[in-house]
Amino acid sequence: MRIAGAIKFVIAVALFLLTFYVISQVFEIKMYSNLGNIFARSAPDTVAHPTTKAPRYRCGISKVCPEKHFAFKIASGAANVVGPKICVDDNILMSGVKNNVGRGINTALVNGKTGALIETTYHDLWGGEVGPFIEFLKKIPDGTIVLMATYDDGATKLNDDARKRIAELGSSLISVLAFRDNWVFVGGKGIKTKSPFEQHIKNNKDTNKYEGWPEVVEMEGCIPQKINE
């Protein structure tokens, strides 16, 4: 009887230990599973999300131009240090980097039909003479887009004849351009109306950004392509 009781006791203990082992294993699996879910939820999202890159328009302007228009961006010079910059249809026509700018009025001539560059030049209207500038203005072909930007001083030697010829290109502000003013303009030879593309900042010692010069004036837009003869 004692032996049978001992056997029963051993069997009971073994069953208890087996049951405890099974329960502990199941609990441990669930615990690891729950911890895995927790860490999975808290882990940072490492999936790369595609970013939308802002579109770049021609000449870096802020909008796309309609069909049959040329994008342009133009900036005057900064004091007598940084030259002006003229861009048309994503082509830099004049800039300090291109080394084709100078003191006075900087001018780029562009074919009104194709947008192709015709000529770039500048005329020193502080230390030079206005005569060559007037002759240049006279010879601009009809249908030509004319882009102008001042650098340092573009007004001292301007006379009434030169101002009149620039006004005929569509300028409304050339009559008030004065010593060291900053001015940018886009017009055309043979234009019938005043151009909407013109900006002017007056040289004023109380508001000048640089000592003796106003801040840079910039302008951008879309020039209609010339269609008809």
Curated annotation (Swiss-Prot):
<keyword id="KW-1015">Disulfide bond</keyword>
<feature type="signal peptide">
    <location>
        <begin position="1"/>
        <end position="24"/>
    </location>
</feature>
<feature type="domain" description="GG-type lectin">
    <location>
        <begin position="68"/>
        <end position="226"/>
    </location>
</feature>
<dbReference type="GO" id="GO:0030246">
    <property type="term" value="F:carbohydrate binding"/>
</dbReference>
<protein>
    <recommendedName>
        <fullName>Protein FAM3C</fullName>
    </recommendedName>
</protein>
<dbReference type="Pfam" id="PF15711">
    <property type="entry name" value="ILEI"/>
</dbReference>
<dbReference type="InterPro" id="IPR039220">
    <property type="entry name" value="FAM3"/>
</dbReference>
<feature type="disulfide bond">
    <location>
        <begin position="59"/>
        <end position="87"/>
    </location>
</feature>
<keyword id="KW-0732">Signal</keyword>
<feature type="disulfide bond">
    <location>
        <begin position="65"/>
        <end position="222"/>
    </location>
</feature>
<keyword id="KW-0217">Developmental protein</keyword>
<dbReference type="GO" id="GO:0005576">
    <property type="term" value="C:extracellular region"/>
</dbReference>
<comment type="similarity">
    <text>Belongs to the FAM3 family.</text>
</comment>
<keyword id="KW-0964">Secreted</keyword>
<dbReference type="InterPro" id="IPR039475">
    <property type="entry name" value="ILEI_FAM3C"/>
</dbReference>
<keyword id="KW-0430">Lectin</keyword>
<dbReference type="InterPro" id="IPR039477">
    <property type="entry name" value="ILEI/PANDER_dom"/>
</dbReference>
<comment type="function">
    <text>Involved in retinal laminar formation.</text>
</comment>
